[in-house]
Design a protein with these regions (language model features):
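Short catalytic/metal-binding and nucleic-acid-binding patches
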Residues: 1-211
């Protein structure tokens, strides 16, 4: 499976990565919360988020890259925040490079904070951001199940609702969220079927991802 394909405007992707060696990405609640805060800061301008899970040594997100018009507006807003902004015309902007730069800035920001907090040096994430294209609605549903079932697969908990750092509980809630909750529920028909499928359908991990 190709894990380093371009992140193109208007397409769905499963994005994921792992800590280097035996390191953990998250050692405490503060790390988890800071990661999500910075994800929202860096990635929400370029993508909509449909589901996620954070495990001590890796993470998974299901996202849709925004369309070119939205990406260009985000680029303009971010560029104008700089001391010396240099705004390219839309026809000259490399959209895929812009998207990847946001992920790179996000990982660098988190790594610097993590290293300072835990008195360590060097890389925290392996390789580059891994991603796979999600091509149809059945694949989208299966990816949501895969992501939410990940903590059970890794024996972090026995019930989906017991793992705090996934989007599963947010999907069941009525509280405001940055997630595309309504669209995700619609993929399953309704909330009842969403819950039933999460508890009755098991996804084959070897055929979906190595994490």
């Amino acid at each position: 499976m190709k894990y380093f394909i371009p992140l193109e405007a208007g397409k769905f992707y499963h994005v994921f990565n792992h800590a280097v060696g035996s390191e953990k990405l998250f050692r405490n609640d503060e790390n988890y919360n800071y990661f999500l805060k910075k994800f929202n800061e860096y990635i929400s301008p370029i993508a909509s988020t449909f589901s996620y899970v954070l495990i001590p040594n890796h993470f998974h997100f299901l996202i849709e890259i925004k369309d070119r018009k939205e990406l260009y507006e985000s680029y303009r807003i971010l560029e104008l925040k700089k001391e010396f902004p240099k705004i390219k015309p839309e026809t000259e902007l490399d959209f895929e490079k812009f998207v990847m730069q946001q992920f790179s800035n996000f990982f660098n920001c988190y790594t610097k904070s993590f290293n300072k907090k835990h008195n360590r040096k060097g890389a925290l994430f392996i390789d580059y951001l891994r991603r796979t294209l999600i091509s149809d609605e059945e694949y989208l549903r299966n990816m949501v199940l895969y992501i939410h079932q990940n903590p059970i697969h890794h024996k972090m908990c026995n019930r989906l609702e017991d793992w705090k750092y996934s989007s599963y509980n947010s999907m069941l809630s009525q509280k405001p969220t940055q997630l595309e909750r309504e669209e995700v529920i619609n993929w399953f028909g309704d909330l009842e079927n969403f819950i039933v499928m999460h508890t009755t359908k098991n996804i084959e991990y070897s055929s979906t991802s190595e994490l």
